[in-house]
């Protein structure tokens, strides 16, 4: 049980949840309105295979980062299993290596677009953490890595993989573009805020984060502005969208989350590492919710049509 708990912490649960929701949300966007059965064996093989490949790739990326950040994590994240000794470095290497190989094998076995999606993600994740490249040393490049994988590669790559696998033309339609743009900007906010709780270790090991360059107050404000823009843009788009959509649900849900964001931000004291970390996890919860709310807004009109 202790080993399982350590592995769960090693996998960085918030990223595992985010990866899971992104795979299933993109799958739902693929089938919505196209008349394909969610329960057909062929479609479920595709989504479960993609889910497993992406989860293994996720563990590879976050695990590799921990292997190269052990000393920093002993200051910033002492609860992680490599930093506190629950896993040895050798064990960490085995986990990362096996997950990376298995992820690529499954992805390429299922198809070109999934192979490219996972392969590109792993290459960027490696460049993010591993010297001599180690892009995480530079705030702009670090943010670019995160938004490229989470915002672009995963959403568009998975969508094309599912489209082709389900027999649809390999075209990127409006719903996936809207989700991708929202997630892209949202991921920028996550990328710039993620280092606010880690100032002490980053300063000591000369990691040039945006927080150290412009201060945590400015990063905090910038994060709120970016997230506000995301929610307002989605609500405005809902008014003008020329496609089947539950407009009221989309607008009300996003404005409610925007209000919750600002209400929650009032309680954050930037001198408290605990409160900053808690707010960072709250931002991830908002990220999770988007992958639930957006497909639901597209599904509700179809659902109501089948009822009435």
Swiss-Prot record:
Family: Belongs to the UbiA prenyltransferase family.
Pathway assigned in UniProt: Cofactor biosynthesis; tocopherol biosynthesis
Name of the protein: Homogentisate phytyltransferase
InterPro entries, sorted: AtHST-like (IPR044502), UbiA_prenyltransferase (IPR000537), UbiA_sf (IPR044878)
Disruption phenotype: Impaired in biosynthesis of alpha-tocopherol.
Keyword Transmembrane among UniProt keywords: yes
Reaction equations catalysed: phytyl diphosphate + homogentisate + H(+) = 2-methyl-6-phytyl-1,4-benzene-1,4-diol + CO2 + diphosphate
Location(s) in or outside the cell: Membrane
Transmembrane segment boundaries: 13-33, 44-64, 104-124, 142-162, 173-193, 219-241, 245-263, 279-299
NCBIfam families: PRK12887.1
GO MF annotation terms: homogentisate phytyltransferase activity; prenyltransferase activity
Biological process annotations from GO: menaquinone biosynthetic process; vitamin E biosynthetic process; vitamin K biosynthetic process
Enzyme type, top EC level: transferase
Entry GO CC: membrane
Function summary: Involved in the synthesis of tocopherol (vitamin E). Catalyzes the condensation of homogentisate and phytyl diphosphate to form dimethylphytylhydrquinone.
Membrane association type: Multi-pass membrane protein
PANTHER family recorded: HOMOGENTISATE GERANYLGERANYLTRANSFERASE, CHLOROPLASTIC, HOMOGENTISATE SOLANESYLTRANSFERASE, CHLOROPLASTIC
EC number assigned by the record: 2.5.1.115
């Amino acid at each position: 049980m202790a080993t399982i708990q350590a592995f769960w912490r090693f996998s960085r649960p918030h990223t595992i949840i985010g990866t899971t929701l992104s795979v299933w949300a993109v799958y739902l966007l693929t089938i919505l309105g196209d008349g394909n059965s969610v329960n057909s064996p062929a479609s479920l093989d595709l989504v479960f295979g993609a889910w497993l490949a992406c989860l293994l790739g996720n563990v590879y990326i976050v695990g590799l980062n921990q292997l190269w950040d052990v000393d920093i994590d002993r200051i910033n994240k002492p609860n992680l299993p490599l930093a506190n000794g629950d896993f040895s470095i050798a064990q960490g290497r085995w986990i990362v290596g096996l997950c990376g190989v298995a992820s690529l094998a499954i992805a390429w076995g299922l198809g070109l677009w999934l192979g490219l999606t996972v392969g590109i993600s792993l290459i960027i994740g490696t460049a993010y953490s591993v010297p001599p490249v180690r892009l995480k040393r530079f705030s702009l490049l670090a943010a670019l890595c995160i938004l490229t994988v989470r915002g672009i590669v995963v959403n568009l790559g998975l969508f094309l993989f599912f489209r082709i696998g389900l027999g649809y033309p390999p075209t990127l339609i409006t719903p996936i573009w809207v989700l991708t743009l929202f997630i892209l900007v949202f991921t920028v906010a996550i990328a710039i805020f993620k280092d606010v709780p880690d100032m002490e270790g980053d300063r000591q090991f000369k990691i040039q984060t945006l927080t150290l360059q412009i201060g945590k107050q400015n990063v905090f404000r910038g994060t709120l502005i970016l997230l506000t823009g995301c929610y307002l843009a989605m609500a405005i788009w809902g008014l003008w969208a020329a496609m089947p959509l539950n407009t009221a649900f989309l607008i009300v849900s996003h404005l409610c989350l925007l209000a919750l964001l600002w209400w929650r931000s009032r309680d954050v004291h930037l001198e408290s590492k605990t409160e900053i970390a808690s707010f960072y996890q709250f931002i991830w919860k908002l990220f999770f919710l988007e992958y639930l709310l957006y497909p639901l807004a597209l599904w509700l009109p179809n659902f109501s049509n089948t009822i009435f």
